[in-house]
Amino acid sequence: MVVLKLLMPESSSQNFNHLKMHSQYSICEGAVKIDDLQDFSKSNKIKSLALCDTSNLCGALEFAEKISKVGTQPIIGTQINFKYGDNVGLLPLFALNEEGYKRIIKLSSNSFLENDELSDPHVDFNELLDDNIGVAIFSGTVFGLFGELFNKGKFSE
């Protein structure tokens, strides 16, 4: 529980949504167990919370079921590596509805299935541009795809 106290405000009235929560399903990025998120959300009356594990949706069902039981609105997301030209970087994606959820499942799966076993999981950025109905796409960080393009002076591409 100590980790959660560092990530969330002390106030019991939530004025923001934490959109980049990583669980134990984000290898080397998160250690928070979904049961702990459930307990924390209940005790702090968190209105909504997003799970955004990297390259997978393995915890999405468990998260949605457990968080919903305590009155917190689950927001399902993931961050996936996208390739644009010779640049690769993460973009956080969030499901706005069931169609968006199915879309990010497909993108997450494709990131593993459509690459050779020697490359890191990624999806061509054009695949996201071609079909993103029901998906909220965030810019990520300076280490994300858009940050990489900006840092290399290629953002206008």
What are these regions (language model features)?
Residues M1-E157:
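Phosphodiester-processing cores and adjacent nucleic acid-binding clamps
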